[in-house]
Design a protein with these regions (language model features):
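Bacterial Sec-dependent N-terminal signal peptides
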Residues: 1-23
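Short Gly/aromatic-enriched secondary-structure transition segments
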Residues: 80-81
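Aromatic-lined carbohydrate-binding surfaces of glycoside hydrolases
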Residues: 34, 45-51, 60-72, 76, ...
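Short N-terminal segments immediately surrounding and downstream of signal-peptide cleavage
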Residues: 22-37
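Glycine/proline-rich low-complexity spacer/linker segments in large multi-domain proteins
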Residues: 90-94
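Extracytoplasmic soluble-region selector
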Residues: 38-43
Length: 287
């Protein structure tokens, strides 16, 4: 009986410790990718007390001890330690971080943020070269977000793949859908209702690749405790939808005097129908 009690006590002591270590694995992985093959003696602890986002760190007996409100805060705390001690930089142009073999002891430093959410990206950011990022590039970007304290990124990848399913269910043909979509580099302006059918169509291969990529992106963001902002129906529709709903009034928009698009009023019942379908398709795919 005494042996069993000792075993049970040891088990109860070890399980929370193991769970705590597992809980901080996403932050530890970010840190390891940032420093490459180097080693840093660091302990990570999430203390999710209610209140503002915060991180704190100190070095005691050569060990860097970081506490934070979540995994993003832990990453932000590590990067603050790196920058404050002139050990390097992690940037879009590359990273150059050199961790000393032995860390000098350092007193406690704590930072509390007055804001709950730290937003990142805008609609236009998703144009230019960003549509062509693969998972390796996205992983670096999400690491950059975590190290800089971002916890609410805009996540628009695969928007068109989902909307294509909606247009198809409504009765549009593949050609009508293809004639609506702009090419990858121009998608932000299509999403804002400025243009359509420029440098398109988007292929099924493109849609499938974007869906697979978005699964990885959202999974990593959520592992770190981020709250990605996903798209919804904004009211812009293919011109061909007038064939299906001739009784509905659509507004024609013009941009730069040369480009035209069609918009559905949010007061129209069809707006709510399409909006509901989009959310259902998105949740079916991504949860």
């Amino acid at each position: 009986m005494n042996t069993f009690k000792c075993f049970l006590s040891a088990l109860l002591f070890l399980v929370p410790s193991a769970m705590s270590a597992h809980k901080t694995d996403p932050a530890r992985n970010v840190i390891q990718r940032a420093i490459g093959e180097q080693h840093v003696n660091v302990s990570l602890t999430v203390r999710g007390d209610k209140g503002n986002n915060y991180f704190s760190y100190k070095v005691k007996n050569g060990k860097l001890q970081i506490q934070g409100s979540d995994n993003v805060a832990l990453c932000r705390g590590f990067y603050d330690y790196v920058k404050s001690n002139h050990m390097g930089i992690f940037s879009w142009s590359g990273n150059n971080i050199t961790i000393p073999t032995e860390l000098q002891d350092q007193g406690l430093k704590k930072r509390v943020c007055p804001f709950e959410n730290h937003y990142y990206f805008n609609v236009v950011t998703y144009g230019y070269t960003m549509p062509y990022w693969d998972w390796n590039r996205w992983e670096k970007e999400i690491d950059w977000m975590a190290l800089h304290g971002v916890n609410m990124p805009l996540a628009l990848v695969a928007n068109e793949a989902i909307s294509a399913r909606v247009w198809s269910k409504l009765g549009l043909t593949d050609k009508e859908i293809g004639d609506y979509f702009a090419g990858p580099a121009h998608l932000p302006w299509m999403r804002m209702g400025n243009i359509s059918n420029i440098d398109g169509p988007l292929t099924d291969t493109w849609h499938n690749q974007q869906v697979a990529l978005q699964h990885k992106i959202l999974k990593r963001m959520k592992e770190l405790g981020m709250k990605p902002i996903c798209p919804a129906f904004a009211g812009f529709v293919p011109k061909a939808i007038k064939r299906l709903y001739p009784e509905v009034s659509f507004s024609e928009t013009t941009w730069a005097g040369a480009f035209h698009n069609w918009m559905l009023s949010p007061k129209d019942e069809l707006f709510h129908t399409i909006g509901k379908m989009f959310i259902e398709e998105w949740e079916k795919e991504f949860g």
